[in-house]
Regions:
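Pyridoxal 5′-phosphate
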Residues: 1-394
Length: 394
């Protein structure tokens, strides 16, 4: 299989991740913080080390605490539902946001009745900073959510500039780093984010089952989930300090062990440099494919290793299904859980895109095979492919 769906999850993982998880699962996968015996203490120490590595990664020492969660969607729900909302609240979201942000906000908006607005885009689909500043002045924000990197076009959004404006109005700022933490060099203090989320299985090259967020020191959240924590068990109340206040239930120590190993591997991998090289290689050669419409960042300086496209004569679902069935190439088709941005793309009426997302282990030869497959799909009549059976996948 030629795997080009790294925005969904990076695959494969570094070999050290598989080795660490296998060994830990066989010999040390006990419940951390739930016992005084050696193995439980060692599991707890491994979790502490993982938090420390995450703090170092985002240069967040003495700036933030790391709260762990089983997925970044859970983490974002903890943040959004952990805030206090009123009818007077004003939330701004970029059009690039994922449903992990949009759906919790919509749920609360319907219940409470506050305002949700989209950040404006310029003609090239970059965030219009001047218009953003004007909108903030006209209707001051109480909450601003921005994706660090679009999971549709690979656009690296100007989060620091947006949050600098938002902080003039003391807004809570949320940076969705699912496609960025581990890839971009982030300095937590410079971001001006109150919360920065991460997904272990994406740009951190760890496994599923471990994610979380950095929460700025001094920022508090209401409790969404309650239960056992392994501490203060004599009380019916959750612990009052972070991260314990926001973490309940047994942790997936095997997944955390995998992330621990990935964090040791990342500094030497230079994944951003690798993605930029691969993206440049792809972009230089895409014009050789007739009938291709491309959706990407406004320019290469703000482009990560994710690009979207559509192929004339085929729905995104049809093209992706043919790439899979005939060429064993894995890409994503659809709206990528980010429908708002599709309203701004030239794929009206919002039919979705073919997404190609590269990772550290992608080879240039695999990109060549993708390009040749796209050319072949355009050349052939495909009479032997049951397109009717493929419709509706998008």
């Amino acid at each position: 299989m030629i795997y080009l769906d790294n925005a969904a999850t990076t695959f494969p993982k570094p070999e050290c991740v598989y080795t660490a998880m296998d060994s830990f699962a066989r010999h040390a996968a006990v419940n951390a913080g739930r016992g005084a015996y050696r193995a439980a203490r060692e599991a707890g120490e491994m979790i502490r080390e993982t938090r420390e590595k995450l703090i170092s990664l985002a240069d967040a020492r003495e700036q933030a605490q790391v709260v762990l969660a089983p997925s970044v969607t859970v983490a974002i729900n903890q943040i959004i539902h952990g805030l206090t909302w009123t009818e007077q609240s004003v939330a701004y979201v970029s059009p690039y946001e994922h449903n992990a942000v949009l759906r919790p906000l919509e749920q609360l908006r319907k219940k409470i009745g506050f305002t949700v607005l989209e950040l404006p885009l310029a003609e090239d689909l970059s965030v219009d900073l001047a218009e953003t500043e004007r909108m903030f002045a006209e209707l001051p924000p109480t909450f601003v959510a921005v994706s660090a990197v679009s999971n549709v076009t690979g656009y690296i959004l100007p989060a620091e500039k947006i949050f600098r404006m938002a902080k003039k109005y003391k807004a809570f700022t949320l940076l969705d780093g699912a496609q960025a933490v581990g890839l971009l060099k982030l300095h937590f203090a410079a971001l001006r984010a109150d919360a920065l989320t991460f997904a272990g299985h994406k740009t951190l090259y760890g496994p599923f089952g471990i994610a979380g967020f950095y929460l700025k020191n001094g920022v508090d959240l209401n409790i969404l989930l309650s239960g056992g924590t392994g501490s203060q068990s004599e009380s019916l109340e959750m612990p009052r300090t972070i991260p314990g206040k926001l973490e309940c239930a047994s942790k997936d120590t095997v997944a955390i062990c995998g992330l621990h190993a990935a964090l040791d591997w990342l500094p030497s991998a230079h994944t951003l440099q690798r993605e930029k090289e691969l993206t440049a290689y792809l972009m230089e050669r895409l014009p050789t494919v007739d009938g291709l419409t491309l959706y990407c960042a406004p320019d290469e300086t703000c482009q990560a290793g994710i690009v979207s496209m559509n192929l004339e004569g085929f729905s995104c679902g049809e093209a992706a299904a043919i790439l899979d069935a005939k060429y064993d190439i894995a890409v994503r088709a659809g709206h990528h859980c980010a429908a708002l941005i599709h309203r701004h793309l030239n794929d009206a009426p919002c039919k979705g895109t073919i997404r190609v997302s590269m990772g550290y282990f992608t080879e240039t030869g695999e990109i060549d095979l993708l390009l040749e497959a796209l050319r072949s799909i355009r050349r052939e009549d495909l009479k032997n492919v049951d397109l009717e059976a493929l419709r509706g996948l998008c």
